[in-house]
Amino acid sequence: MSGDFLIKNLSTSAWKTNITVLNGSYYIDTSVCVTRNQAMILLSIIISLVGMGLNAIVLWFLGIRMHTNAFTVYILNLAMADFLYLCSQFVICLLIAFYIFYSIDINIPLVLYVVPIFAYLSGLSILSTISIERCLSVIWPIWYRCKRPRHTSAITCFVLWVMSLLLGLLEGKACGLLFNSFDSYWCETFDVITNIWSVVFFGVLCGSSLTLLVRIFCGSQRIPMTRLYVTITLTVLVFLIFGLPFGIYWILYQWISNFYYVEICNFYLEILFLSCVNSCMNPIIYFLVGSIRHRRFRRKTLKLLLQRAMQDTPEEEQSGNKSSSEHPEELETVQSCS
């Protein structure tokens, strides 16, 4: 993500009313644009606040209250990335709101611009890895269950966090977001690297998700649909609808900016709002999937709903297994490797 992209779109100075020359005549911002920006900022603040609360609940249960497995480790790290992204956007939108509504011009610390880059790249990478793992478990089930290293999930997440942080810091330093050390050549270089990273993971996410869906619904040996597959499918779908536009916008920003003569009237805030919705929706998906066809007469705690959303056992098998019903954290399918 380029330094220009963040500074021009997120600094409070970018929202000052300006007059721009367009085809030889003067063009001034309309009240419609200002009203739209105010609405988008308020909605982004509200969604970010709600999303932080929901992701905090997921972090609490998965990090402390629940037994973790290969898949829940990824969900835990995805919730961390979403929480971090929403926190940074909440602070940035709040500072912009102070200027828009109260004309209080607060300079946003440049270091804060690095956090959305880091969090977005981490979330994208982790979600792509989730899709890849489930695809591998379908294509090579025996290898996945018997030969997969035990701590693959934790190690993979650690590597993705480190790589995303390193890329965010290097780009932030080169583009003047850290230490006020702008270098045009290295800024453009890291912009290209970041864009390549994003495009590769976009492609991997789409390809592995499509392969997974084809094997589930169209394969010669259809795979039983479990809550886990529903959770993954909905999470990927929500990202493609709400999260992907943010990545596409930053990749194409170098070209898009040439057509936006009036910065205040572009669509950045709408895209920012959609990205906040994406990070907010994941916990909602978990709880909704966990509550589907919940026929037992028992209290539906959030912990139980979250456990059921991660269930990798078909419903008919679960209903016939009383022991599994009493301990939903152990519902992950276990097969012999002999």
UniProtKB/Swiss-Prot annotation:
Where in the cell is the protein located? Cell membrane
Q: In which tissues is it expressed?
A: Mast cell-specific.
**Name this polypeptide is given:** Mas-related G-protein coupled receptor member B2
Residues on the membrane's Cytoplasmic side span 62-89, 133-157, 213-231, 290-338
Instruction: Write out the topological domains of type Extracellular.
Output: 1-40, 111, 179-191, 253-268
Purpose of the protein: Mast cell-specific receptor for basic secretagogues, i.e. cationic amphiphilic drugs, as well as endo- or exogenous peptides, consisting of a basic head group and a hydrophobic core. Recognizes and binds small molecules containing a cyclized tetrahydroisoquinoline (THIQ), such as non-steroidal neuromuscular blocking drugs (NMBDs), including tubocurarine and atracurium. In response to these compounds, mediates pseudo-allergic reactions characterized by histamine release, inflammation and airway contraction.
Q: From which source organism is this entry?
A: Mus musculus
Chain intervals for the UniProt region annotation (Disordered): 310-338
InterPro entries from the xrefs? GPCR_Rhodpsn, GPCR_Rhodpsn_7TM, MRGPCRFAMILY
User: Family, per the entry?
Assistant: Belongs to the G-protein coupled receptor 1 family. Mas subfamily.
